[in-house]
């Protein structure tokens, strides 16, 4: 059965440590490689929920279930891992579905390709009960494509909240430095006049 095969593969990959490594997702991501199907609402929801921050997106269109899905996902990860694209992170997204429809994301070759990615991988694969093995092998995972967009936006949102405070601290520091320099000039000027 699919459930038994899922459990056996999970055990095997867990023993190998495939699910342990979690690389940090870069702050303020700018260039995103996306692997998904161009058809359906998933890619639309994902891009709609990315903040308007000028992300550069390189997209690989592939089937995400059925015939050709495994090969397409592997091809997408390998293609987008090439340094010539200059990407910060890979995103693998699809909507939810049954255990049967998620088989490409429970495929050993797909899981190992994700684990072997040069770039950090975020998996945004909708699921209810059985978390796809691809999500476990990814460096970060969100339960939906929309939640994946929120995860990517988070560091930019934190930065935009922090910038005004940093600006105030910098202005205060500059004012303090200027007061100190002004005082030193006054002391030196007074010293020169009295010499």
Where would I find each of the regions flagged by the language model?
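Charged, elongated alpha-helical interaction scaffolds
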Residues: 128-195
């Amino acid at each position: 059965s699919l459930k038994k095969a899922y459990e056996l593969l999970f055990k095997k990959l867990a023993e190998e440590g495939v699910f342990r490594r979690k690389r940090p997702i870069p702050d303020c991501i700018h260039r995103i490689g996306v692997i998904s199907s161009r058809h359906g609402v998933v890619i639309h929801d994902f891009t709609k929920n990315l903040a308007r921050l000028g992300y550069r997106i390189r997209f690989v269109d592939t089937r995400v279930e059925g015939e050709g899905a495994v090969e397409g996902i592997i091809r997408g990860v390998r293609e987008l891992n090439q340094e010539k694209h200059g990407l910060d992170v890979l995103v693998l997204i699809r909507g939810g579905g049954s255990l049967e429809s998620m088989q490409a994301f429970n495929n050993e070759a797909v899981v190992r390709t994700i684990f072997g990615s040069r770039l950090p991988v975020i998996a945004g694969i909708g699921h209810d009960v059985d978390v796809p093995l691809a999500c476990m092998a990814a460096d970060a995972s969100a339960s939906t494509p929309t939640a994946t967009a929120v995860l990517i936006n988070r560091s930019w949102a934190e930065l935009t909240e922090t910038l005004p405070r940093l600006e105030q601290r910098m202005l205060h520091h500059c004012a303090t430095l200027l007061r100190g320099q002004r005082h030193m000039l006054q002391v030196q000027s007074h010293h020169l006049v009295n010499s």
